[in-house]
Amino acid sequence: MKILYITNGIHGAGGLERVLSVKASYLADVLGHEVHIVVLNNKGASLFYEFSAKIQLHHVVVNGNPISYIWQYIKGMRDIVATLKPDVISVCDDGLKGFFLPLLLPKIPIIYERHVSKQMAFGVHPSLLKKLRVALQLQLMNWLGRTFDKFVVLTQDNVQEWKLPNIQVIANPLSFYPENQSSLTNKTVIAVGKHTYQKGFDRLLQCWATIVKTNPDWSLEIYGKADEKQGMFQLVKQLQIENNVRIFEPVPDIATRFLASSVFAFSSRFEGFGMVLIEAMACGVPCVSFDCPCGPKDIIRSDEDGFLVPNHDLDDFTQKLLQLIENQELRNKMGAQAKINVQRYLPEVVVKQWDELFKSLAK
């Protein structure tokens, strides 16, 4: 089967790029499909994640004013589809333009993959004008979402967000599942994500300032793209926790960092899914997470393989971290269960669902 993915880019260090590298590579290498990916303005850029050598990349150059940009986008997509004649198309574009593709391309089975929550469109402290504009855009997306053969989301929360008749839930697959697991003996708590309001590291740092008062020999390590505007470095100094917090840029092999950690802290205010949660669990690391939309409640079985804390309850989040920090036996028990429970996200389980969906539509 010939499968075409349409996305903005695959060269970044984000969750969508990581997930696409796993899915597309598994479809090509293990299931034997012919996989193509079309990206925008990425020619010559180096890849952060590894993609199968069997995958064929196609580049569409789009630039200029909005009218010129859209025209180049439409023409580029039509030309590639006409040349490749794929059996099925999957659109991984969280912007508005991708929603119009069923109306603009030849009649080929087409799927939309939604990788983010609707909440992300509103941003931080939106003005009334922005709220109205985003609300109208989401209404348009809801209408256009019905034009796809399938609209695939990641969590049950997303189903409630969209309420579409053609909706289906397929979670993200794991990008790794090490044979070994963390010893959970290092006095390190890990967090992973970009320095944005969404990721809630300001909340985590406030909790950490309380924790180190009684556990000064523990360290918090945060991996992710830094942004001085978010004020994280300043907050670390303000809270006087410089000796207990280390901040790193993204690393391709995050598994080694999970394996050297004992607890994973997930402080997001809202999410699309929470890839790093299942990655930590794959390394046998117990997680403490806010019960934010969307993802954590689908992933964590609270009090079994980690802790789910009411969103915004910093005191409870702090207490749950302390429970794991101060109880090696509890860490071992939850970490072992996490590694078992997370197997439902293995590629052979998740990508099989995609394979079945593609085959059902391409009949």
Predicted regions, residues:
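Conserved acidic donor-binding segment of nucleotide-sugar-dependent glycosyltransferases
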Residues: 301-303, 307-314, 322-329, 343
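Conserved donor-binding/catalytic core segment of Leloir-type glycosyltransferases
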Residues: 4-6, 181-199, 205-208
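N-terminal strand-loop element at the rim of the active site
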Residues: 5-13, 18-20, 26-68, 161
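Short His-centered aromatic/hydrophobic patch
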Residues: 91-97, 114
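Aromatic "clamp/platform" in nucleotide-sugar-dependent glycosyltransferases that forms part
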Residues: 250, 269
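Donor nucleotide-sugar binding/catalytic pocket of nucleotide-sugar-dependent glycosyltransferases
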Residues: 138, 142-179
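A short, well-ordered alpha-helix in the C-terminal region of glycosyltransferases
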Residues: 316, 323, 330-344, 353-356
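Short hydrophobic beta-strand element within catalytic cores of glycosyltransferases
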Residues: 286-290
